[in-house]
């Protein structure tokens, strides 16, 4: 069974979104300076602060996804509304820098998750079901290179394959026992896997906001790029999942890898 012409166009669009320039490159273009400069202005304890903020944000996102996300029907996603909320939240991060991250990031992450769920619904996902909820959380791992990645092995399908077992174990645990024991190994492993990738992008955001004179306006713009990135990842991710519901998954991956962008 071949893939319809319109669906090939959608697949190409998804690949364009998913394999786009990195978050760091986009932030550097905004600032007009390499993002590495920002790391020079972070305190010695910044890695621990980012790790704690990232884990806290993803734990909150997991709770939000499992307990509150549903199938309210909307034909389109409210990308602009969520973007405005994230921009407003980012202004505080730009003003107060790293100390504000532990407060600002969980709020921004929840706003982004709402937007991701909105995009998922617009691509035909049933968000009341557990598997699509976990797929929404999976978006936070897209577009960030983990320390365990080797060279170019960071493409979309490679990341999904790397996370597959961890996601499956967490989904099975939640299906049986819910979130009653949040320190359960399956859930801890899921948060750790997501943190290893999402944390890289949070570090880049923190470094950008640490650059002197970035201010509230700069912080707001950085958050705009931050949510833009994850909205793009979500759109590409859920387009592919929609196509996988229509065609053989291996066929979709083969066609994806053949496409030039």
Language-model-detected regions and their locations in the chain:
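Glycine-rich active-site/cofactor-binding loop and its immediate structural neighborhood
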Residues: 85-103, 107-110, 114
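Terminal, membrane-proximal amphipathic helices
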Residues: 1-89, 114-261
């Amino acid at each position: 069974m071949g893939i319809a012409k319109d669906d090939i166009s959608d697949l190409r669009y998804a690949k364009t979104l998913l394999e786009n320039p990195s978050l760091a490159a986009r932030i550097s273009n905004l600032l007009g300076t390499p993002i590495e400069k920002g790391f020079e202005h972070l305190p010695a304890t910044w890695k621990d602060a980012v790790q704690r903020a990232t884990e806290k944000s993803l734990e909150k996102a997991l709770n939000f996804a499992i307990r509150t996300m549903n199938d309210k029907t909307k034909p389109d996603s409210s990308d602009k509304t969520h973007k405005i909320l994230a921009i407003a939240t980012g202004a505080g991060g730009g003003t107060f820098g790293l100390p504000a991250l532990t407060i600002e990031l969980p709020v921004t992450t929840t706003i982004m998750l709402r937007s991701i769920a909105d995009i998922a619904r617009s691509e035909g996902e049933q968000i009341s079901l557990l598997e699509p909820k976990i797929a929404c959380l999976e978006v936070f791992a897209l577009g960030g290179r983990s320390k365990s990645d080797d060279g170019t092995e960071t493409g979309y399908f490679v990341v999904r394959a790397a996370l597959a077992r961890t996601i499956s174990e967490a989904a099975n645990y939640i299906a049986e026992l819910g979130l009653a024991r949040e320190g359960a190994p399956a859930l801890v492993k899921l948060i750790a896997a997501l943190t290893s990738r999402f944390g890289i992008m949070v570090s880049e955001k923190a470094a950008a906001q640490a650059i002197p004179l970035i201010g509230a306006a700069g912080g707001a713009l950085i958050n705009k790029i931050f949510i833009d990135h994850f909205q793009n990842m979500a759109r590409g991710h859920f387009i592919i999942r929609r196509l996988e519901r229509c065609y053989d998954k291996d066929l979709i991956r083969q066609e994806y890898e053949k496409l030039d962008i």
